Amino acid sequence: MKKTPRSTARELALLALSQLPKKSGSLEKKQLQEVVLAAVRTLRIEAQDILETAAAELQRGSDRLLNSQIDTTDIESARVMLYEAIELGQTAINRIGTAVELPEMLQLTNQLEVRSYAMEVLTKVNGNRKEVDKLLQESIVDWQIERLPRIDLDILRIAVAEMMFIGIQKQVAISEAVELAKRYSGEDGYKFINGVLRRVFDKINVI
């Protein structure tokens, strides 16, 4: 799926948030800019790591295929090795599919529009964290936000800040948060994040 500048900015802001202190505090613009630059470097490293891992998996798959022809004396062993080789190949292809998106994303991070919006998101989240976290705590059922994985909490904070302080349409903010969760959160994290933000949506509409 083709990334928009704002989708890229949100991802950049998410990576940058992970490098900010857990407690909110006053941060100068220069400090935030340095955090954004560090997030860009993280993306570059991620792209390199994905490709290196995919290459290693393809090599292991190739070795399995070769061994299935040379080292096995029965059909069942050969079948197992062949299956493992196919599985490694499929995993590598999936990784490469992810890596293919990263060059475009890295190119987008150089755009002023992308970095400016990432900075705006960071500024709003950091400057209004108490209010954002209060609303999130009220919207999470039988759980404390301090116990959430940091990545999930930061995705939620971005969406709430966009809805409350940047003026992004609520459905758009929720949809974008779900996409971030599918990429960065645990297996079912996106479902949890979607549910919490739906409740946030209802509370904001009442305010």
Swiss-Prot record:
GO terms for cellular component: cytosol. GO terms for molecular function: RNA binding. Keywords: RNA-binding, Transcription, Transcription antitermination, Transcription regulation. The keyword Transcription regulation applies. Signal peptide: none annotated. GO terms for biological process: DNA-templated transcription termination; transcription antitermination. SUPFAM superfamilies: NusB-like (SSF48013). Belongs to the NusB family. Involved in transcription antitermination. Required for transcription of ribosomal RNA (rRNA) genes. Binds specifically to the boxA antiterminator sequence of the ribosomal RNA (rrn) operons. HAMAP family: NusB (MF_00073). This is Transcription antitermination protein NusB. It comes from Trichodesmium erythraeum (strain IMS101).
